[in-house]
Amino acid sequence: MAQGQRKFQAQKPKSKAAAAERSRGPRKGGRVIGPKKARVVQQQKLKKSLEVGIRKKIEHDVVMKASSSLPKKLALLKGASKKTGATPGKTPS
């Protein structure tokens, strides 16, 4: 028999969201565990920045090529994250 009480009893989650999260079970897909060694972390950071730079360069080249071949100027659309609250059709009063 055990000597004394258990220190940490299993408790039910207080909120519904936490209870649902717990009962959902394991998620699909693989897990990505980051490296511990500083040198490998640095290499991955460098690799990521190079990949981003290369991708931006390729996108820029494609846009320049497309805009030079079109008779009308090519308009680029940026993400909708810049619009914060203000709707384009209405003016504040």
Swiss-Prot record:
Leydig cell tumor, testis and placenta. Signal peptide: none annotated. It comes from the Eukaryota. Residues 7-18 have a biased composition (Low complexity). It holds the Pfam family DUF2462. Residues 1-41 are annotated as: Disordered. This is Leydig cell tumor 10 kDa protein. It comes from Rattus norvegicus. The lineage of its organism: Eukaryota, Metazoa, Chordata, Craniata, Vertebrata.
